[in-house]
Amino acid sequence: MTREKMWTTRREAMALLSGAVAGVAFGGDVRAQGTPKRGGILRISAPTNPSSLDPATGGAGSDHAFLFTMYDTLTEWDFETLKPKPGLAESWSFSDPTTFVLNIRPGVTFHDGTPLDAEAVKFNLERNKSDPKSNIKADLATMASASVTGPMQVTLKLNALDAALPGILSDRAGMMVSPTALKASAAGNVARTPVGAGAYTFVSWADGEKIVIKRNEKYWKPNRPYPDGIEFAIIPELTTGVRSVTAGQNDLIYQLPPRQKVVVERSKDLKVFNGPTLYVFQIFLNWAKPPFDDIRVRKAFNMAIDRESFVKAALAGLAEPAYMNLPKSHWAYDKSVAALTPYDPAQARKLLAEANFKEGTTIDLVGYPDQDSVQRQEILIEQLRKAGISVRFLNAPIAEASAAFFGAEKRGSGLLAAWTGRPDPSLTYSLMFTKDAYYNGGRGAVPPELEAAIKESRASEDVQIRTKAFATVQRLVMENAFVAPLAFQFELVAMNKKVQGYRPNLLGKPKYDDVWLES
């Protein structure tokens, strides 16, 4: 099967989801009106402080909103289908099943003037794969070696065919960092001083307050970007963020909770986009330590959650209940897996009794302190209580909470957060459900057949073969109750009417490729 045929089939299989994103389900005008103009500062209300501005070392999906502005990727994803398309690599091919060739776009430089050539790409890929600080090793698990086979060509030898690789390189693993900047850093990373090859260059970061970037005047895409710069105001309380946009202090706010939809639609000066995404609220579980080291407790925990009620109470009905990590309209979704996690508090109590889990025992979960997160926590606390499960939330800002749960501290037994989706579903599963994956919070053991199925999902370009493999992956994840998925939230973005050219996307991660400001 050719690559084009594979993606045609995928588009058909994703018709409902991508069709909605193409315009039907989104409020507002998806395409820009008028002739784009250069100039102005785009002011954005951002709900989170980044965990890191180094794509290899960050640990929060919310980082992408910042990373995509400063780092270009080897491939890019199509906004409507997530099909990979040329980026810093102007073309790629599998010369044989285990040889992947990247042809790098000539004439591109990093922000510090370092050439973005084959040597730079090789350096980045090897760092992402092998550096102890890298949190994205699993992305490049199939890469055995990288070699320079021409001034602008890199050849990867793979330990198995990896059909997902073009899509993987449109995410963190494909974000290119200046080797010069990395080698000059005593810490071995650019977490606070990012140097990429993206549309904007870094200016400053006042932690928890503001991030400022300016136009890259040597950017390789003609006439891009349009704004002179972007200022991100870090405003965790979304009610405050909305007020900043309605008052004109900021121009755009993203990742709005559904309860804000009525508020922003009421403003005559704002336009609103909303539609489905792969963004899923979930509770990450540490199954390497009590009580979730017992599969019966994990299953009981899942059965104690009424997802339909959660969507109505926490998300104003603007979401899809989640019974696995893919929504119903995704091409790899397997409806039989949804039946593995019914709402059944009586059966949950029975499983807890079998596990000798004493009612009243408190499970510590990590969470976030903002108003909407706390509301979600309160709903879950009450639902779990009905099944005899008591939970306590240890709240901290997103970057701190994520590092505490996934990092060395291993704080809490679970983390109420979100998985922001990936261009290829194999990334979602390999990053959470393989033994050494960063988002496997306790680095807990997984069944060999699960790791084998994840590998199989990447071993063919035939979408039917991949779909069958993903059915096995989804079944094994939920049979083992390694995660407690809750709901797929719709993207909700509000902006001043002077903001033109914004395009929503399936990942729900904002990109500003075509954004310009009316004067």
Question: How would you name each of these model-derived features?
Answer:
Residues 44, 113, 383-433, 469:
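Periplasmic binding protein-like
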Residues 93, 138-182, 204:
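Surface-exposed binding/hinge segments that line
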Residues 217-263, 390:
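Ligand-site clamp/hinge motif
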Residues 372, 392-402, 428-497, 519:
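Extracytoplasmic/peripheral linker and loop segments enriched in polar/acidic and small residues
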Residues 78-83, 171-225, 229, 346, ...:
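Gly/Pro-rich hinge or "lid" segments in bacterial periplasmic/extracellular proteins
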Residues 45-96, 126, 193-196:
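N-terminal lobe/hinge region of extracytoplasmic solute-binding protein
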Residues 117-124, 151-155, 198-199, 226-229, ...:
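Alpha-helical secondary-structure segments
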Residues 320-354, 372-375:
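Structural transition elements
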